[in-house]
From Swiss-Prot:
Phosphate binds at residues 86, 124-126. Homohexameric ring arranged as a trimer of dimers. The gene is rph. GO terms for biological process: rRNA catabolic process; rRNA processing; tRNA processing. This is Ribonuclease PH.
């Protein structure tokens, strides 16, 4: 039995609140149960130095957690003067995931930065960030299209969503919350496109190694869950 009472293949309630920020070109408050992340997309008319005069743009991401996003207050990383390894890993994952469905040539020599700020954490912050970041990116591109800068359908090739799966109490489960994640035997994150293409899989056995059969089950759970998330994205932008 899962602590939340959910079935093994049941995700938490997911919601998207678009245009949460009045300043950003695109923004979305995404909620996966009690995990809440604010995703904002900011447009700059410049590219990183290595892309100058290439005709290509860039999509990148930054990730952070508010000090009291968790049970006990965390020290701000800015106060220590450097980002932690986990933060760097997650923000690179978000950027890679989004770029997988963006035609950088069609974007032109511009940069879109997605900021993912975790307001409240209860497991799955990176997967919620990726899923919400796609909405923020979409709205940023729609903002650009309204000013005749780009055509969204040429720049954005597909949806991107992500979900966690793992083995908890010897059962393969989807969308782990903190209680499950902190004691899971196996923890994995899946990032996939709307068409079912695999962008990234991160999987770790926390205790006992997992079998190929168990991995296949997790993959099946993730595929179904991501299809559900993509459908929710489509409903949100309709």
């Amino acid at each position: 039995m899962r602590p939340s009472g959910r079935k093994t293949d049941q995700m938490r309630k997911v919601s998207f609140e678009r245009n949460f920020s009045k300043h950003a070109e695109g923004s979305c408050l995404v909620k996966f149960g009690d995990t809440h992340v604010l995703c904002t997309a900011s447009l700059e008319e410049k590219t990183p130095p290595w892309l100058r005069n290439s005709g290509k743009g860039w999509v990148t991401a930054e990730y952070g957690m508010l000090p009291r996003a968790t049970g006990e207050r965390m020290k701000r990383e800015a106060a220590s003067g450097k980002q932690g390894g986990r933060t760097q890993e997650i923000q690179r994952l978000i950027g890679r995931s989004l770029r997988a469905v963006v035609d950088l040539k069609e974007l032109g020599e511009r940069q879109i930065t997605i900021d993912c700020d975790v307001i409240q954490a209860d497991g799955g912050t990176r997967t919620a960030s990726i899923t919400g970041a796609w909405i923020a990116l979409y709205d940023c591109l729609k903002w650009m299209e309204s000013r005749n800068m780009i055509k969204v359908e040429r720049v954005l090739k597909d949806h991107i969503a992500a979900i966690s799966c793992g083995i908890f109490a010897s059962q393969p489960v989807i969308d782990l919350d903190y209680l499950e994640d902190s004691s899971a035997e196996t923890d994995a994150n899946f990032v996939m496109t709307g068409k079912g293409g695999i962008v990234e899989i991160q999987g770790t056995a926390e205790g006992t190694p997992f079998s190929e059969e168990e991995f296949t089950t997790l993959m099946h759970l993730a595929k179904n869950g991501i299809a559900e998330l993509v459908e929710l994205q489509k409903q949100a932008i309709a």
